[in-house]
């Protein structure tokens, strides 16, 4: 078992290890990768998003809508902004993901303790976050939205009532959920 670096200096080691295990690291961007990932996962398990702790590059382009018979719908071209990110994520070999998770779990556990959970198992938080994402409904048809001047909201009350993390997944499109 290799010696792990201090949490503060772990990002270069994590990136190098991911790279050597076949994970494409180009989309990753964070100077504190482990800490940021832990904060993101902790928030995801509660259905929330943390936009200031993004560990991957944001997609190019803007959210787009289209009008059909006077109603607004998410333009399917809007979903394509996320294709590269989703393709990258699903390209990660499960074995490499598990191996690296197990290797760096002590650092993730330390970071989890720093944000207020010193006695909780980070793996439980990870599984809860995955459950939240897996519970996102997959739309069968075009998704109707309303323009509320500041932002678009979902016309379907069931979609609008979803936690922010699931609403973000809906914005990525049914093929990317």
Where are these regions (language model features)?
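Acidic/histidine-rich, surface-exposed loop or edge segments in extracytoplasmic proteins
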Residues: 10-24, 78-91, 162-170
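Generic structural concept
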Residues: 38, 105, 127-130
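Mid-length scaffold segments of soluble, non-membrane domains
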Residues: 64-124
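A cross-kingdom marker for long, charged
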Residues: 141-177
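Short secondary-structure subsegments characteristic of cysteine-rich extracellular domains
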Residues: 121-137
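Generic detection of long, well-ordered alpha-helical segments
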Residues: 27-34, 98, 174-177
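N-terminal Sec/ER secretory leader and immediately downstream segment
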Residues: 1-71, 77
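Long, hydrophobic, amphipathic alpha-helical segments used as structural scaffolds
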Residues: 45-48, 52, 93, 112-119, ...
